[in-house]
């Protein structure tokens, strides 16, 4: 009897619930963007829990909505969030359509780096990673060099404890294997990569495109390990005024100001000014040397977009940078520059650049690109003087042609490099003449590329480049790529190619100029050759509750012939350069992950496992200063209705082999696991202003932890108290018990501890 009563009550409850639900209202409609239906977009109410998602055709439906006023929020990967206030009448049916605008997601960004053509990222057979300013704002930095620490597989590497020179590693390969472009032009190269990278302000950047693996078939020498293309802002899209100013509790000050002027209907002109100042002497490890290099830097940038008939392109850009930096003994000032009493490393840098693009007035799409830069460096490393001048000119003409299912690209290029310094490197071989002999390199090249659409899902790319180096002769670099778009959520890319590289000693190892080591070139250095294959798989998931997941998995393998190696271990007083009598390998796996939840949480994380080895005479050794694992993350959350967002960013590195001076050197032969972590709060409640503040290096990690010192014999940087035996080897004495000489190159991470920061951004559209 009781069972029947329960069944009756349950049935009546269900009928009553269905009746009540049937009294609600309905909202349905179509959501689209400029590219068509917006699939898998989430529609939710900020004031209650009901939500739904658009189908594959862009349609949605919300049922059983009580009468009332609601704030509907439409969110989707790749689109700006849209919020609309909706009034729902009792038992009504409403049709509401929405148009979404493109947001900061990078899945469908237009990229140019992979193929020298402007294509959607998803259409490119070459995997190009895209990073926008919104990504770098999660951990604000004064320049591009520092900003790249949050990119998986890319590591800014400091090479000197005193002057803080650095380069950029991609997949564990040293800086010389990374090509850095500015708007596709080889502006940052050779000498300028040592100090020029820190002079590129973030305010110039529209986006950064990263290609991992060789791209020599399109870009020539240096694009062996990968390339980084810094795309500057378009004057037509830039705000009228933009300002970003921040400072840290370490007394670092950075200011970015840009403004736009429209010259009638003829041109748009964007001007940017960046100033960075750090003059606070810090010595927390108590070695009487500066922990961080003091810097005073200004950079001026201007870009013109000139209007032409038929919307043909014509842009010009110029940049000037001046920097004065020094590090060393706490007692150092400019009066000791170049002397042997108080050690300091002082570098004055003057640099200017000009670059442009001009579309020729033909029916065929032909583009002339050109750039020129001069880099003047006046430096003292203790008593060692290094004064260098570099001039690089580049021009390239491309012809973009479509023929059926063939997307063709043909190009010719010419690169001129002038390099001169005050060392024997640029001295005439005839010592009796004692004449200066600058290095002048001519590098003409021609290339062709054919992207073939076999079907809607299958593409292949064939490319080949021929260069003639005035020192090394003929160089041929082929390329192959294949893309299989299984469906909109699954994609496979396969890339293979070759690369080549020539050497620049100062760029190869800054330790050559510390004054602590003698540079020895054992034999005539031949160009390196590399052979690479890269397999990439992208998988995207759109979950019904509005959650989005994307996984980007890549495996890479590179084989090197004639690998140029700087031997720091054979003799503590020398750097010995030679081609490896064997081969080198670089292999590993990259995984990038992007998760977006409908309630405002976003996670961007990645990890790279890699192995970089040198194989000579049957002996395999791990490359110095190269980790086997690196991980990065950025966790962001926006609090609803509060205009407050929080960003937690960081990276982690596995141990790496470090260069020691001898077997008695007490410093650790390898680094520990180490991590730099940061947190930031941003307030955007004001119309034109946003404030941000936070803490950098939450764990207060520095490389001196666990070591008795990181700079060997900082108290005797000129080695005046070092004794040698008859063979030139250092003797152990009571004053020098470990038999060491001055060595500032034991460094693998930034020597800057925990600090706070505060900043504001102001923008007028």
Regions found by a protein language model. Give the residues of each.
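Short acidic/polar hinge/loop motifs at secondary-structure boundaries
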Residues: 63-64, 169, 185-212, 300, ...
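N-terminal periplasmic accessory domains that precede
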Residues: 95-98, 144-147, 166-169, 181, ...
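Extracytoplasmic beta-strand/coil segments of soluble accessory domains associated
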Residues: 145-186, 206
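Flexible loop and strand-edge segments within Gram-negative outer membrane beta-barrel domains
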Residues: 278-299, 305-366, 372-391
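Membrane-embedded beta-barrel scaffold of Gram-negative outer-membrane proteins
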Residues: 367-379, 485, 493, 526-579, ...
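Gram-negative outer-membrane beta-barrel transporters
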Residues: 453-457, 551-559, 579-660
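C-terminal beta-signal and adjacent terminal beta-strands/loops
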Residues: 652-659, 683-765
């Amino acid at each position: 009897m009781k069972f029947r009563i329960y069944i009756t009550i349950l049935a009546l409850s269900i009928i009553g619930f269905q009746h009540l639900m049937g009294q609600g209202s309905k909202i349905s409609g179509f959501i689209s963007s400029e590219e068509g239906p917006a699939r898998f977009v989430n529609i939710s109410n900020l004031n209650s829990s009901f939500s739904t998602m658009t189908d594959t055709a862009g349609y949605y439906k919300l049922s059983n909505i009580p009468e009332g006023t609601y704030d509907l929020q439409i969110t989707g990967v790749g689109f700006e969030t849209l919020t609309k206030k909706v009034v729902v009448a009792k038992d009504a049916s409403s049709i509401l359509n929405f148009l979404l605008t493109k947001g900061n997601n990078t899945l469908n960004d237009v990229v140019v780096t992979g193929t020298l053509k402007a294509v959607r990222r998803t259409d490119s057979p070459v995997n190009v990673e895209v990073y926008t300013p919104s990504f770098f704002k999660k951990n604000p930095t004064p320049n591009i060099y520092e900003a790249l620490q949050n990119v998986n597989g890319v590591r800014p590497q400091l090479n000197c404890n005193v002057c803080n020179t650095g380069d950029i590693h991609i997949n564990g390969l040293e800086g010389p294997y990374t090509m850095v472009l500015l708007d596709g032009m080889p502006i940052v190269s050779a000498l300028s990569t040592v100090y020029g990278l820190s002079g590129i302000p973030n305010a110039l950047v529209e986006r950064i495109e990263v290609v991992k693996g060789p791209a020599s078939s399109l870009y020539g020498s240096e694009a062996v390990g990968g390339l980084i293309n810094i795309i500057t802002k378009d004057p037509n899209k830039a705000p009228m005024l933009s300002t970003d100013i921040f400072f840290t509790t370490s007394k670092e000050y950075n200011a970015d100001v840009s403004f736009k002027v429209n010259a009638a209907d003829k041109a748009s002109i964007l001007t940017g000014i960046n100033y960075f100042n750090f003059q606070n002497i810090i010595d927390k490890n108590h070695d009487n040397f500066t922990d961080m290099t003091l810097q005073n830097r200004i950079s001026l940038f201007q870009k013109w977009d000139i209007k032409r008939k038929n919307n043909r392109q014509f842009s010009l850009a110029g940049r000037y940078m001046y920097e004065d930096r020094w590090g060393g003994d706490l007692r150092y000032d400019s009066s000791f520059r170049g002397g042997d009493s108080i050690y300091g490393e002082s570098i004055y840098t003057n640099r200017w650049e000009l670059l442009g693009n001009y579309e020729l007035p033909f029916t065929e799409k032909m583009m002339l690109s050109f750039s020129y830069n001069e880099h003047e460096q006046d430096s003292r490393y203790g008593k060692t003087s290094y004064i260098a001048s570099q001039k690089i000119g580049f021009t390239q003409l491309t012809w973009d042609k479509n023929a059926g299912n063939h997307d063709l690209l043909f190009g010719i290029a010419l690169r001129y490099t002038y390099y001169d310094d005050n060392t024997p490197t640029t001295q005439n071989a005839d010592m009796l003449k004692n004449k200066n002999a600058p290095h002048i390199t001519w590098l003409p090249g021609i290339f062709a590329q054919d992207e073939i659409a076999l079907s809607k899902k299958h593409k292949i790319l064939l490319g080949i480049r021929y260069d003639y180096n005035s020192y090394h002769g003929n160089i041929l670099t082929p390329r192959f790529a294949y893309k299989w778009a299984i469906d909109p959520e699954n994609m496979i890319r396969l890339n293979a190619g070759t690369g080549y590289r020539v050497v620049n000693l100062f760029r190869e190892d800054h330790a050559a100029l510390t004054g602590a080591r003698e540079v020895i070139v054992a034999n005539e250095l031949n160009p390196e050759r590399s052979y690479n294959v890269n397999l990439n798989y992208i998988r995207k998931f759109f979950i019904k509750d509005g959650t989005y997941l994307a996984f980007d998995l890549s495996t890479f393998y590179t084989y090197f012939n004639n690998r140029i190696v700087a031997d720091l271990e054979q003799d503590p007083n020398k750097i010995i350069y030679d081609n490896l009598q064997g081969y080198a390998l670089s292999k590993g796996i990259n995984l990038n992950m992007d998760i977006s939840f409908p309630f405002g949480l976003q996670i961007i994380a990645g990890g790279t496992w890699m192995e970089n080895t040198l194989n000579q005479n049957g002996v395999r050794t791990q490359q110095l200063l190269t980790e086997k694992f690196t991980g990065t993350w950025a966790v962001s959350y926006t609090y609803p209705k509060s205009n407050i967002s929080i960003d937690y960013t960081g990276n982690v590195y596995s141990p790496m082999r470090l260069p020691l001076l001898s077997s008695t050197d007490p410093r650790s032969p390898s680094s520990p696991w180490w991590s730099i972590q940061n947190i930031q709060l941003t307030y955007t409640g004001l119309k034109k202003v946003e404030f941000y503040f936070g803490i950098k290096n939450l764990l207060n990690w520095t490389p001196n932890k666990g070591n008795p010192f990181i700079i060997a014999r900082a108290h005797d940087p000129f080695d005046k108290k070092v004794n040698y035996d008859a063979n030139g080897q250092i003797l152990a004495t009571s004053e020098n018990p470990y038999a060491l000489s001055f060595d500032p190159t034991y460094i693998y991470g930034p020597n800057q501890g925990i600090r706070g920061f505060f900043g504001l951004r102001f923008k007028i559209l």
